[in-house]
């Protein structure tokens, strides 16, 4: 049975691998500097997000992108506001703190950073002037940690709040492609590009072997990135490998019949399988945890079901509820098929 543990268990989508093989014997400068593939990928991304004034840089993975993106826009006496389940707060081993910056979590429980909760953190942190870490940025993820997709209204509300407090806006886009192709999405990437100080387009979790593309509008991060990515151990000597992959992902030659890049096509397939899984599990009587129209789906199960699913399909446990039941996660990837979903549903039916 296929695993539903995460969206990076497989290697890479065939079109991505084909591009790597086709260019394998080419020789290019290192470190993403001046090679033809990185430069073309940068321009393709600028064109796609609708901004020619941004820098496009590459990081090896999400943690590296977050470290450089967050610390490059903050002084060491400043902090970043995020939700309590934000990735930089709970899943990156204190990397922001290790770089001398402070994470300031809110009590938002649904994965979305709200103006009301962010205001509480702001009021507390600024209540004694120079004696506390000063908030200087907000950090959000699209999709959220529990699969939520930001609406344009909600995104604009938190951006308006941040701008009214002169805070920078960083969007973790490890699963940006899933968010953008969700059937419930009304927030285009071009609008994110207009409002965010920086964001990134995740490749690792969307059919690439590795790599994230940071889109940087903030002048401080533009200046800092080349140095921070090296200092923090994230600069690849064979940087052209990142350029080749993102070039293939946004190359017009790989656009589908609907006129969207390969980057979106891969995510759209994963989302479709995830929605099929969600609906099938609900039909079998499994309780969804929250609401997700992206490639991550969460369900409330008994401890016995938790163990059975973990062994059969690799589901991971995210929370233990007060009544002892577990919240487990299923993730679909570019490689997931409808047949894979149906096989897992047949198993789920047997233990319902």
What positions do the PLM features span?
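Catalytic PLP-binding core of fold-type I/II PLP enzymes
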Residues: 150-182
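Active-site C-terminal subdomain of aminotransferase-like
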Residues: 134-144, 149, 187-294
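General beta-strand structural signal in soluble alpha/beta enzymes
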Residues: 3-6, 56-60, 82-83, 140, ...
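PLP-dependent aminotransferase-class I/II
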Residues: 100-145, 149-157
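Conserved N-terminal alpha-helix of the aminotransferase class I/II PLP-enzyme fold
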Residues: 13-62, 84-89, 95
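Buried hydrophobic positions in well-ordered alpha/beta secondary-structure cores of metabolic enzymes
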Residues: 4, 45, 65, 96, ...
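Conserved C-terminal alpha-helix-loop-beta "cap" of PLP-dependent enzymes
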Residues: 75-77, 275-350
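Conserved PLP-anchoring active-site segment centered on the Schiff-base-forming lysine
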Residues: 72-90, 119
């Amino acid at each position: 049975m296929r695993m539903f543990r995460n969206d990076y268990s497989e290697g890479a989508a065939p079109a991505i691998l084909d591009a790597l093989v086709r260019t394998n014997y080419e020789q290019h400068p290192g470190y993403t500097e001046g090679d033809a593939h990185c430069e073309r990928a940068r321009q393709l991304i600028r064109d796609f997000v609708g901004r020619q004034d941004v820098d496009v840089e590459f990081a090896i993975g999400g943690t590296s992108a977050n470290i450089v993106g967050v610390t490059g826009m903050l002084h060491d006496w400043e902090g970043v506001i995020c939700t309590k389940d934000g990735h930089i707060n709970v899943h990156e081993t204190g990397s922001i703190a290790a770089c001398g910056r402070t994470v300031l979590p809110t009590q938002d429980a649904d994965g979305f950073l709200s103006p009301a909760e962010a205001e509480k953190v702001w009021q507390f942190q600024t209540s004694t002037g120079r004696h506390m870490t000063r908030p200087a940025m907000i950090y959000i993820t699209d999709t959220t940690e529990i699969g939520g997709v930001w609406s344009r209204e909600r995104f604009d509300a938190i951006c308006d709040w941040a701008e009214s407090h002169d805070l920078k806006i960083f969007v973790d886009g490890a699963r940006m492609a899933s968010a953008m192709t969700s059937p419930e999405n009304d927030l285009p990437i071009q609008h994110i590009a207009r409002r965010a100080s920086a964001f990134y387009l995740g490749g690792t979790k969307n059919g690439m072997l590795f790599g994230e593309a940071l889109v940087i509008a903030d002048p401080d991060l533009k200046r800092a990135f080349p140095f921070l990515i090296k200092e923090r151990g994230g600069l690849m000597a064979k940087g052209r490998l990142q350029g080749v992959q993102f070039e293939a992902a946004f190359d017009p030659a790989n656009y589908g019949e609907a006129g969207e890049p390969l980057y979106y096509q891969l995510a759209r397939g994963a989302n479709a399988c995830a929605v099929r899984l969600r609906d099938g599990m609900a039909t079998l009587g499994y309780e969804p945890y929250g609401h997700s129209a992206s490639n991550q789906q969460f369900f409330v199960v008994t401890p016995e079901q938790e163990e059975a699913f973990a062994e059969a399909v690799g589901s991971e446990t995210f929370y233990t509820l007060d009544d002892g039941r577990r919240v487990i996660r299923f993730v679909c990837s570019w490689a997931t098929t409808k047949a894979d979903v149906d096989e897992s549903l047949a198993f789920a039916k047997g233990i319902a």
